[in-house]
């Protein structure tokens, strides 16, 4: 299945296609998560959260060229990593303010 067909099938809720997408891109997304996460457990959580979001919004994906699916998934993952870091910093500031 091409990446374009894979994205369309995932958008239709095809569980087999979702499994294929995860199997095909999971290790690359996890490697990306490890660059942004504080520790391995955080990287696993980030990857899981990223795939949940990817599957939720994959209907918005617009295929433009080979490799665009991974680029789109990577951008979602990076944005989620930045959002998570912002939340952690905000929480840390709140905890410091309480002291």
Show which residues each predicted segment covers.
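Arg/Lys-rich amphipathic alpha helix in sigma70-family domain 2
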Residues: 59-60, 64, 74-96
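Structural recognition of an alpha-helix C-terminal capping motif at a helix-to-coil junction
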Residues: 45-52, 56, 67-79
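Conserved RNAP core-binding helix
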Residues: 4, 22, 30, 40-57
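A short, charge-rich alpha-helical start-of-domain segment used by transcription regulators
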Residues: 8-31
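Extreme N-terminal regulatory/targeting segments of RNA polymerase sigma factors
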Residues: 1-8
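Sigma70-family region 2
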Residues: 11-12, 35-38, 51-68, 87-89
């Amino acid at each position: 299945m091409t990446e374009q067909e894979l994205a369309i099938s995932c958008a239709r809720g095809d569980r087999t296609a979702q499994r294929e997408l995860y199997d095909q891109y999971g290790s690359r997304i996890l490697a990306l998560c490890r660059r942004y996460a504080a520790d391995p457990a955080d990287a696993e959580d980030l990857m899981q959260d990223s795939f949940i979001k990817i599957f939720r919004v994959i209907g918005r994906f617009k295929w433009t060229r080979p490799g665009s699916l991974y680029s789109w998934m990577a951008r979602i993952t990076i944005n989620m990593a930045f959002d998570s870091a912002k939340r952690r910093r905000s929480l840390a500031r709140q905890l410091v303010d309480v002291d």
